[in-house]
Amino acid sequence: MSLSSGACGGKGVDANPVETYDSGDEWDIGVGNLIIDLDADLEKDQQKLEMSGSKEVGIPAPNAVATLPDNIKFVTPVPGPQGKEGKSKSKRSKSGKDASKPTPGTSLFSPSEGAASKKEVQGRAGDGASAGGLVAAVAPKGSEKAAKASRSVAGSKKEKENSSSKGKKERSEGVGTCSEKDPGVLQPVPLGGRGSQYDGSAGMDTGTVEPLGSIAIEPGAALNPLGTKPEPEEGENECRPLKKVKSEKMESPVSTPAVLPLHLLVPVVNNDISSPCEQIMVRTRSVGVNTCDVALATEPECLGPCEPGTSVNLEGIVWQETEDGMLVVNVTWRNKTYVGTLLDCTRHDWAPPRFCDSPTSDLEMRNGRGRGKRMRPSSNTPVSEAAAASDSKGTSSSSKTRAGANSKGRRGSQNSSEHRPPASSTSEDVKASPSSANKRKSKPLSDMELNSSSEDSKGSKRVRTNSMGSATGPLPGTKVEPTLVDRNCPSPVLIDCPHPNCNKKYKHINGLKYHQAHAHTDDDSKPEADGDSEYGEEPALHADLSCNGAPVPQKGSLSPARSATPKVRLVEPHSPSPSSKFSTKGLCKKKLSGEGDTDPGALSNDGSDDGPSVMDETSNDAFDSLERKCMEKEKCKKPSSLKSEKIPSKSLKSARPIAPAIPPQQIYTFQTATFTAASPGSSSGLTTTVVQAMPNSPQLKPIQPKPTVMGEPFTVNPALTPAKDKKKKDKKKKDSSKELESPLTPGKVCRAEEGKSPFRDAAGDGIKVESLLNGSSESHQSRLASIKAEADKIYSFTDNAPSPSIGGSSRLDSTTPTQPLTPLHVVTQNGAEASSVKTNSPAYSDISDAGEDGEGKVDSAKSKDPEQLVKEGAKKTLFPPQPQSKDSPYYQGFESYYSPGYAQSSPGTLTSSSQAGMEGQPLKTKKDEEPESVEGKVKNDVCEEKKPELSNSSQQPSVIQQRPNMYMQSLYYNQYAYVPPYGYSDQSYHSHLLSTNTAYRQQYEEQQKRQSLEQQQQQQRGLDKKTEMGLKEREASLKEEWKQKPSIPPTLTKAPSLTDLVKSGPGKAKEPGTDPAKSVIIPKLDDSSKLPSQPPEGLKGKLGEASHLGKEASEAKTGTECGRQAEVDPILWYRQETESRMWTYVYPAKYSDIKSEDDRWKEERDRKLKEDRSRSKDSVPKEDGKESTSSDCKLPPSEESRLGSKEPRPSVHVPVSSPLTQHQSYIPYMHGYSYSQSYDPNHPSYRGMPAVMMQNYPGSYLPSSYSFSPYGSKVSGGEDADKARASPSVSCKASSESKALDILQQHASHYKSKSPTISDKNSQERDRGGCGVVGGGGSCGSVAGAGGTDRSADRPRTSPSQRLMSTHHHHHHLGYSLLPAQYNLPYAAGLSSTAIVASQQGSTPSLYPPPRR
């Protein structure tokens, strides 16, 4: 090339420029953008060059120009590669050409070296063309090259390689030139470097440079001292262009863009513009050839973006899912890894479908089979290329990026390619040839678009391309992702979208979550649903398949995946061992459970966090697969249990990306850290507690522990370890009756018996999941409950990021004593509610009871009570369970209520027991909804009896959990925010049940009587126990205060007197005026209180006038604590009375059950209110504060206020705002949950709620948030409840958000008054059963503190969460006050009803009454 000689003189430049220029035509054809931008200059240059080709050659500038043309040349082709890897490649080719010609490639790379500047300076004469061009700046070529260098960071390798065609040509020509040009600087290094660049860089380019876009240039620069020998380069380059051409699949498309900038730079940097332009033209021509090469390269493998309908298999790691359903994935496509690619989860099969437990396992599976799978799934070149390029670059760079975060995602996605194609389409192709293909088609659109757009900036994404390459490396960085993957992997069971019209099934709760959040109405995820449904049809098989990436192959791969797991987990090969065990013995889930679980579980448990994590992941992965397989194979107890576990696994899996916005727990970064620290710490690093938790979880919580553990692992591998350990242990327990297992054994028995039928149904009803989601199938409900509970737990964990141990450890480990409880609940949730109870008996009898109770098993009276609470809660959450499945990612609303609420209500123990209980509740709800509907009342009674026990047991854990709850409160709040919907729902149910169910009505009337007593007591408590009038006055003033504080209507003060309440009711109505939803809610609460069966109560008499408002007022009064709840609840009830009735019709059994439970818990609440009043007497001076304090919401004033929990809970409508504001990301979950539970556009509660909003926030997120706040406050406030009650003002003022705290507390008190929080005994029972463990946890917990120091001591600890959760489950489930909160939602919109309410209610105290439902 003359260009090179240009350094010496430019004679060569003239000649070669002409040559290059000759290529100019081609170049024109090849590169349109460059031509467009450079056209004028190039034409000028062309004319100049043609007119005086060697005229300027003598000038050093012409050399630079010539070099610049070279640059332009590569730049021209480069445009394709530049933006993207393809561009980079294209560019590289051109760069190489350039380098070889004038050695501009050298300068291009040189700049990276630093030699570029020298060369540039020198090269101004000749080398500058190449060196200067790269350096950027000095000469047009310099700047062009600099631009190119920057662009070519990834493109440089392409320049190098692609330069082979033209570059080689030019290099061969310019070898001498290059040498001439860069004799001192460029040539010596460049020659050797270039040889290296093209030789070593050839491999490096593909493997290293491509994956590492920026590094590519540097290696290029280093190698590209390029002076290297253009000739060797040429030889190499010629070969390389072919190779590189392939590599540069998308060079052409990107080529144009890259060219433009370079071309622009060229004109800008044209020191020797006249010459440079000419030479640029010349060079451009040569580049034209390269462009042709690039085009060829692009055409075969690297064609432009795929057509819209094209089904593309992408291998990628899902880093997180955004709340709007976008998956942030590192995808490898066409041998290029795009790091920030966004995929629409609803339109593509995405990571959640990747059920591989461990990202590592996914990676490894992808490695051994994953890569093959990748190739297999993508029968098209992209797969092969991905396999090849992914392997090569995965090896070099994948281990870097992927090691950090992709290990899990990409391989995992491939591993669970069946279900995870969205993230890793390629892998999914195998699984979803039909559905995956469909999804792929959708995904390719988005993915391709993303890739097209991302490829420019995502050259480095390739790093993640090789999920296998990074199998080992990615593990660390992937730890978070692994959690995600693990979470995703563990949930092979498809989760059906609870949405009535939605048939979508999500392998991942993430998918469901995102789907619910934004795809509720669209079936974009349908492909995934198809895959899922495929999976759902064959839950076990597909679960195994999904979980392990391939049915049997995945099992076989599972071992690799497991192998990857060990990498990720850092666990001993044991992980792989379980992996192979699970893989090999996946079919023998039982046996595997015994072996793998024991081995992995014990190993994991006994091992370190990492060990357990590995084991968990392995266990989870294997267990998921095995569970699913076993479930499929053995749809017996064990299969049922496994199924349950599986479902939780799935939930976890789904939840894992839960972080999506905050991807499953993993996505929750803080959760990852928290769970890693807190979970492991809380859980004794999850190892110690996990071991216990695992035993516990195996007892009854394989699912719960799994979710818990999974939740933690979800957040952190350690957390995952508990989940897996739990799962393993669970399986262990199932397989072997060990001490830990003994609970599980009973759980297993129960599970086998009850869980078996529901979970077997779930297993058998993989499809039933849909029904379950719809609440149609009890078995599905159980399953969904398990999944939701798990996901919820996971989500709770996520929400509980502050105290991962609460979410995972606390549920699992935090409450070691209650851990069995948690496991029990998990088991309960697993569908072995009764068995769960049995399982629970060992360490967590109470919560265990909850699970059992749902099953109607009295095996554990204590356990049964909690179980019943769980069951009742589940019933209340009957819809929520459905939504849970749907919102599973979002906290599955109610699941959050009860399951997460429990776990989250108590930072440590309560979390385990509460969450376990809550989870059990969902299971119960699902499982027992049908049975429980009938036996709901009886069971409720039993539950009431047992609830005190559970309460006591729960309370202790609650205490443990309360501390963690402080920091977990925000999470808890989010989770607990769901509780209000529960209570509200319960109120809705309540109203319906009151009207439809005589028994329930009686119970409710009793509750209301108690509430009346509570109100009286609260009145007394306000002024004196018997100073009702004084209290009324106080409440009136409080009411006014609250009114002043928009949100705090008389609810708080109202408790004293029905009349006051009636006043309160109107006041509340007015307050609801402030809080649009509030007035509605007030009627609802009123409705709840009043309802047909309410009239008998004295409250009812007054309600006669203000019937709903009056009832609401009376309810509000019924417990200033509970009064707020009751108050809001009655309004909500009123509003939801219609909805409730509708729900009753829709789910009459559930509603009757819930209502009876509601009645029970109301009675309990009355009792509790009495207790609270007595306890509140110390708080009497400050009825508000007292109520707030007694409301548990106040307990963790700072936290609750911080979470706006007080607000959220206090104002069911308004509360939505606060929790939403505080936890907007979670709000969608709660929202969706409530919505899922019972979104009736016709229902008054939903009146103001746009259906779309509801769909977006399936569980009435706002209300959920609101609900959670109380839980959180109650949980953390369990201990603070006493303080708050003793010194309400102190509690309130203790937190900067004392207002919110007050609101929360008032909500809690409201719930107390509404739920049997006040009544110590019944209250506990009812709180557990009726008040809702979550609700009870919040308001009961507060009651325990305010109205029941006893309770605070006993109940508030665990019970607050659980009790509150149950009550709230009932209330929220009935009244869906959350939906009323969604009334606020309309104005609060996506934000937070609570936040809006908070602003409306100016003063938090005011918030209390309205929030109270």
From Swiss-Prot:
Question: What task does this protein carry out?
Answer: Transcription factor, which activates RAG1, and possibly RAG2, transcription. Through the regulation of RAG1/2 expression, may regulate thymocyte maturation. Along with NIPBL and the multiprotein complex Integrator, promotes cortical neuron migration during brain development by regulating the transcription of crucial genes in this process. Preferentially binds promoters containing paused RNA polymerase II. Up-regulates the expression of SEMA3A, NRP1, PLXND1 and GABBR2 genes, among others.
- The UniProt feature for the cross-link Glycyl lysine isopeptide (Lys-Gly) (interchain with G-Cter in SUMO2) gives its location as K479, K788, K1063, K1155, K1299
| Skewed-composition ranges (Basic residues) | 725-735
Show the ranges annotated as biased composition (Polar residues).
423-437, 797-843, 902-916, 950-962, 1288-1298
What UniProt keywords are attached to this protein's entry? Activator, Developmental protein, Isopeptide bond, Metal-binding, Myogenesis, Nucleus, Phosphoprotein, Transcription, Transcription regulation, Ubl conjugation, Zinc, Zinc-finger
InterPro entries in the cross-refs:
ZN608/ZN609, Znf_C2H2_type
Tissue expression, as annotated, is:
Expressed in myoblasts. Expressed in neurons in various brain regions, including striatum, prefrontal cortex, olfactory bulb, midbrain, cerebellum and hippocampus. Expressed in neural stem cells (at protein level). Expressed in thymocytes.
Q: Spell out the Basic and acidic residues composition-biased ranges.
A: 519-529, 625-648, 750-763, 854-875, 925-949, 1022-1044, 1099-1115, 1154-1189, 1197-1210
Decide whether keyword Transcription is in the record.
yes
One record GO biological process: positive regulation of neuron migration
Residues annotated as carrying Phosphoserine in the record are 358, 361, 379, 413, 433, 446, 452, 467, 470, 533, 575, 577, 742, 757, 803, 841, 845, 848, 1057
- From the Swiss-Prot or TrEMBL record, give the protein name: Zinc finger protein 609
Q: Write out the biased-composition intervals (Gly residues).
A: 1330-1348
User: Which compartment or compartments is the protein found in?
Assistant: Nucleus
Q: Where are the zinc fingers (C2H2-type)?
A: 495-520
What are the GO cellular component annotations? Answer: nucleoplasm; nucleus
- The UniProt regions of compositional bias labelled Low complexity, in chain numbering, are 386-405
Q: What induces it?
A: Down-regulated by ZNF608. Isoform 2 is up-regulated during neuronal differentiation.
Subunit field text = Interacts (via N-terminus) with NIPBL. Interacts with the multiprotein complex Integrator.
Residues of the region (Disordered) are 1-26, 47-196, 354-484, 517-659, 695-765, 797-962, 1004-1127, 1154-1221, 1273-1369
Which GO molecular-function terms appear in the entry?
A: DNA-binding transcription factor activity, RNA polymerase II-specific; promoter-specific chromatin binding; zinc ion binding
Residue numbers carrying Phosphothreonine:
T381, T745, T822
